[in-house]
Amino acid sequence: MANSQSVRTVVVPAAGMGTRFLPATKTVPKELLPVVDTPGIEMIAEEAAAAGAARLAIVTSPSKDEVLRHFDEFPDLVEILRARGKDEQAAKVERAAEIIHPVAVTQEKPLGLGHAVGLAEPVLDDDEDYFAVMLPDDVIEPTAAMSEMIRVRQEQGGSVLLAVEVDPAHVSSYGVFDIEATGDARVKKVVGMVEKPAVEDAPSNLVATGRYLLDRAIFDALRRIKPGKGGELQLTDAIDLLISEAVSYTHLRAHATDSY
């Protein structure tokens, strides 16, 4: 259950085509591919609920209704499983509908992460000053990272972005942080962000991973930035715009991250 000190809404961009996982994703959305026996989107829902969120705004394409349907109740299936003595499996089927309240947000065209996040603005309540973004591709350790990000926001204010260190040779695949030290070894002040820089131009080897705790002002910034390659709106460009206007950003370093 959400409380006054927790994030209320978590936005999950899930409209991508999943091309890295073809041919499996021809018919099964990437977000429903299992990590062991649990779909990635359900793991995200669990993480969001653990951070106190009450609402999961899932941004999907018109052809990916199955992602939202995963959170439906399946009483007929549960009844069959229980009749066969498969109570453990029945409980797993029931679990998804009990985790969090899902809300569908439709992205008609894949126009970038920033565009997907911007579409979720109407889902937020009028009094929500901040919200979270979780990317379902990234499995984060520790799983309580969002709760720690909320703590950092309460103590220092501003938005909080999760970062990991990568091999400097690979920075051109990520949004890269330009940072300054703070009194906390795990928390740095973000003074800039660069989307997929050349190796020689990268300000650090600390890169954005799939967890963001953002002030509501990001929506206005997304309306003001210009589309980049392919007409896409990049979330990092909107963040960098707000940083240039002296909006406070910090980042918290994760222990590890993986993509599935």
Which functions belong to the PLM regions below?
Residues 183-203:
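A short, charged helix-loop
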Residues 250-257:
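Conserved small/polar residues in nucleotide/adenosyl-binding loops
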Residues 206-213:
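A conserved mid-domain beta-alpha-beta active-site/ligand-binding segment of alpha/beta enzyme cores
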Residues 69, 77-79, 87-180, 214-216, ...:
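Conserved beta-loop-beta/alpha segment of the NTase-like Rossmann-fold superfamily
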Residues 241-249:
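Catalytic donor-sugar/metal-binding loop of nucleotide-sugar-dependent glycosyltransferases
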Residues 2-82, 147:
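N-terminal glycine-rich phosphate-binding loop and ensuing alpha1 helix
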Residues 227-237:
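Short, charged, surface-exposed loops that flank catalytic or proteolytic processing sites
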